[in-house]
């Protein structure tokens, strides 16, 4: 009886097909069919590839043989044999001989490779005024401040004892109306007023009574890069009842010449450590003056909780009235 093959492609079915042993009409398989019988010895010559293998062919005569028919290996030490012969020192694998000093890897004589170029050849700053903004002053530009931002000078530089206050600007000069800007300082008490008129520091009163503030002179043109006017401050010498130092810039004869701070580009104030030259902070005033004739640039003031600590605030407040207006505000007679 024909038994069909098991169905193909079925999945998940664990019942596989087998022929039942009692199928009618099908005789039982020979019980001896699967019994192992050892092979009988035979004198019949096996064909190539049969088992057991035929007797090995004898090797050609004339060459000495080892038992089993294998060729005799080369004598010990022959080229290509193992172990390899001892190589002469320095030829293969041996460490290289010590090179004479200076041939390989020794440092080059000073000045041949990588030595710094002579000063002024590469990377030197361009002459003042040729390209864009002026180069940053020595010691880096310091922290760039924005309007009303405050900074603790003492925390930024714990060694700070003396200040350099630099004020700079450019002017749009005309042949008939030259610009003359002046930097001034007001030494104020806790009430926000000068104690006497001598607390007003400017080009005609360059040194304060306590010698703590010193004006370095008037720049009548505003020409050149960097600081146009400089004020030096000895913080340790400032009188105890002075709590604020106000730094301002005014335009001389502004009303007569019809001038204001819209005609003064690239104005700034910077604060530096006078003893080390390190710039602590810088405030760009170019957009702060507007159509005004006086500009309060910034203030150096005592820390209310510790009078020995000093801070700076970027004010940037433009005002009308030029210098006479500031004198009235701060109580100068």
Swiss-Prot record:
Superkingdom, natural source: Eukaryota
A Pfam family reported for this protein in Swiss-Prot or TrEMBL: TerD
Region (3 X 5 AA repeats of motif A), start-end ranges: 48-83
Alphabetic keyword roster: cAMP, cAMP-binding, Nucleotide-binding, Repeat
Annotated Pro residues bias: 70-86
Region feature 5 X 9 AA repeats of motif C, mapped onto this chain: 87-134
An example Gene Ontology molecular-function term: cAMP binding
Residues covered by region (2 X 12 AA repeats of motif B): 84-107
First and last residues of every B- repeat: 84-95, 96-107
Low complexity bias: start-end ranges: 46-69, 87-132
Matching CDD domains: TerD_like (cd06974)
Entry's Gene Ontology cellular component terms: cell surface; cytoplasm; nucleus
InterPro entries: Stress/Tellurium_Resist (IPR051324), TerD (IPR003325)
Region (Disordered): 1-144
C- repeats: 87-95, 99-107, 108-116, 117-125, 126-134
Intervals holding A- repeats: 48-52, 67-71, 79-83
Biased composition (Polar residues): 16-45
Family from the record: Belongs to the CAPAB/TerDEXZ family.
Assembly, per entry: Heterodimer of CABP1A and CABP1B. CABP1A/CABP1B could also associate with p31/p34 to form an active complex.
Protein name: cAMP-binding protein 1
Organism, scientific name: Dictyostelium discoideum
Organism phylogeny: Eukaryota, Amoebozoa, Evosea, Eumycetozoa, Dictyostelia
């Amino acid at each position: 009886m024909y038994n069909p093959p098991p169905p193909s492609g079925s999945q998940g079915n664990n019942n596989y097909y087998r022929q039942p042993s009692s199928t009618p009409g099908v005789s039982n398989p020979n019980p001896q069919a699967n019994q192992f019988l050892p092979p009988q010895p035979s004198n019949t010559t096996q064909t190539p590839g049969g088992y057991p293998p035929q007797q090995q062919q004898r090797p050609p005569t004339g060459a000495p043989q080892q038992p089993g028919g294998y060729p005799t290996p080369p004598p010990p030490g022959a080229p290509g044999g193992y172990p390899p012969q001892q190589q002469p020192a320095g030829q293969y694998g041996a460490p290289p001989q010590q090179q004479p000093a200076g041939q390989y890897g020794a440092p080059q004589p000073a000045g041949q490779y990588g030595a710094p170029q002579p000063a002024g050849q590469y990377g030197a700053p361009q002459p003042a005024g040729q390209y864009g903004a002026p180069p940053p002053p020595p010691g880096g530009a310091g922290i760039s401040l924005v309007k009303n931002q405050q900074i603790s000078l003492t925390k930024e530089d714990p060694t700070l004892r003396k200040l350099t206050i630099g004020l700079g600007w450019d002017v749009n000069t005309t042949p008939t109306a030259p610009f003359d800007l002046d930097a001034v300082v007001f030494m104020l008490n806790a009430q926000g007023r000068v104690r006497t008129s001598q607390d007003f520091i400017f080009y005609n009163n360059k040194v304060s009574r306590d010698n703590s503030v010193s004006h370095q002179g008037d720049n009548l043109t505003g020409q050149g890069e960097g600081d146009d006017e400089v004020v030096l401050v000895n913080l340790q010498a400032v009188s105890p009842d002075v709590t604020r130092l106000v730094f301002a810039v005014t335009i001389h004869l502004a009303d007569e010449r019809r001038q204001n701070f819209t005609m003064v580009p690239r104005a700034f104030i910077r604060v530096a450590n006078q003893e080390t030259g390190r710039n602590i902070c810088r405030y760009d005033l170019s957009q702060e003056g507007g159509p005004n004739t006086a500009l309060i640039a910034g203030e150096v003031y005592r820390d209310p909780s510790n009078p020995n600590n000093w801070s700076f605030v970027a004010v940037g407040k433009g005002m009308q009235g030029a210098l006479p207006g500031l004198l009235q505000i701060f109580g100068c007679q």
